[in-house]
């Protein structure tokens, strides 16, 4: 156990939710839309020979322009852009779904240069800011970074459900995310049999052990180690006293947060857990994956629907965060202190392939929803003919935005030094409030 109070006392009342859109999303129907056949770009189309199924896409409206002829591969009308009301710089594809009503909070980053089309490498690059070293992560992931910077005294600094979480030595080891395949797996580990002792007896044992650890700490030359034991035992007491099993039980979460559409994707339950865990103040960072975006074939017809389900989930998540009081800041809501980042491996090709799907492409977009970032804001661009990232001004010259830039900006927003965690990347201050 490392020193119990290591690191600066920063952002101790903030919470973080990280979502990986697994498989590589098609930004041309979502965050960086295209509805014209220009250059090598084949926009999504509806109709009998179209590339997608528009029926379940609530914001799909056939374009008033002439139908697009994709030769033997596809043909049909594309879509009308989706814009927020008022004079907004944001433009979306029809997959944005219910999240459109929260557009005033959204920070969209387009034209992110990935320099890879490998799922594993792109995922690691997006979450750590470093490409893989062979098959191994070269840096810790963003949930580990924020757990180290803000959550070491939390009961669970970081909990990761199928998220690309990595730990590389440097941050405090208490920041290592608890990685599980499902929320229910954590619930199973919390079940205690009453056959041998009662909850009160277990609590009494924890009290004695905590007192003993502190007493030994007063006599030890390495008091921090024993104080760390005491903190862990205190955390175990809080966990037992809160009946945390309910927070990790799927049926309980579904009943408590019944406006989520749990049938949309197995990952939706993780969003409900995030609200419950933050409300109880037991987790600093919740990270999870929302999958099924790898659409190389005719399964591309469902790509906009999968994105709509993702964005609908985030919209409902924000609704709950708006309604829930912050556990330690009276008068504030969870949404005042919860920060969300969404990213994918990379994006999909602007061309439709012969299988009526899209392949891998070294461009990307990211979405941030945070009170510390400018809302109703977009930064970065991809070119209109090839969907490749366009350069912008940085201190080292003109270049495209990269994942390390996005991660550095996010880390810096909470008073932490990006250089503690990231080798590369420049803080993009234009994205931050103030």
Per-region residue spans from a language model:
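Ligand-binding pockets and gating/stacking loops
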Residues: 1-434
């Amino acid at each position: 156990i490392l020193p119990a109070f290591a690191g600066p006392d920063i952002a101790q009342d903030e919470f973080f939710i990280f979502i990986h859109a697994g498989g590589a999303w098609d930004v041309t129907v979502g965050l960086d839309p295209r509805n014209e056949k220009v250059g090598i770009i084949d926009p999504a189309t509806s109709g009998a020979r179209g590339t997608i199924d528009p029926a379940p896409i609530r914001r799909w409206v056939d374009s008033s322009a002439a139908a697009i002829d994709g030769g033997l591969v596809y043909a049909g009308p594309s879509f009308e852009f989706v814009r927020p009301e008022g004079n907004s710089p944001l433009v979306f594809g029809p997959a944005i779904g219910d999240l459109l009503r929260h557009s005033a909070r959204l920070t969209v980053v387009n034209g992110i240069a990935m320099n890879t089309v490998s799922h594993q490498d792109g995922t690691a690059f997006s979450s750590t800011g470093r490409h893989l070293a062979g098959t191994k992560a070269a840096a810790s992931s963003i949930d580990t970074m924020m757990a180290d910077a803000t959550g070491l005294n939390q009961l669970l600094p970081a909990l990761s459900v199928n998220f690309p979480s990595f730990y590389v030595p440097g941050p405090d080891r208490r920041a290592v995310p608890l990685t599980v395949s499902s929320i229910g797996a954590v619930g199973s580990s919390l079940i205690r049999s009453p056959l041998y002792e009662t909850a009160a007896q277990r609590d009494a044992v924890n009290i004695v052990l905590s007192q003993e650890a502190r007493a030994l700490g007063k006599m030890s030359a390495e008091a921090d180690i024993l104080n760390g034991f005491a903190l862990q035992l205190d955390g175990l007491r809080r966990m037992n006293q809160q009946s945390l099993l309910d927070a990790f039980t799927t049926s309980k979460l579904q009943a408590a947060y019944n406006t989520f559409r749990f049938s949309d994707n197995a990952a939706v339950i993780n969003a409900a857990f995030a609200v419950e865990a933050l409300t109880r103040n037991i987790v600093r960072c919740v990270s999870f994956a929302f999958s099924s975006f790898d659409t190389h074939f005719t399964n591309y017809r469902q790509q906009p629907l999968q994105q709509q389900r993702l964005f609908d989930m985030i919209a409902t998540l924000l609704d709950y965060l708006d309604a829930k009081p912050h556990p330690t800041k009276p008068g504030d809501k969870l949404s005042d202190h919860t920060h969300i980042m969404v990213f994918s491996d990379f994006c999909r090709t602007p061309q439709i392939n012969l299988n009526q799907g899209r392949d891998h492409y070294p461009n990307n977009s990211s979405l941030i929803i945070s009170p510390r970032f400018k809302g109703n804001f977009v930064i970065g661009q991809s070119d209109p003919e090839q969907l490749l990232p366009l350069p912008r001004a940085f201190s080292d010259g003109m270049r495209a935005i990269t994942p390390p830039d996005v991660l550095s900006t996010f880390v810096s927003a909470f008073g932490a030094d990006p250089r503690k965690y990231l080798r590369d990347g420049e803080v993009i201050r234009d994205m931050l409030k103030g």
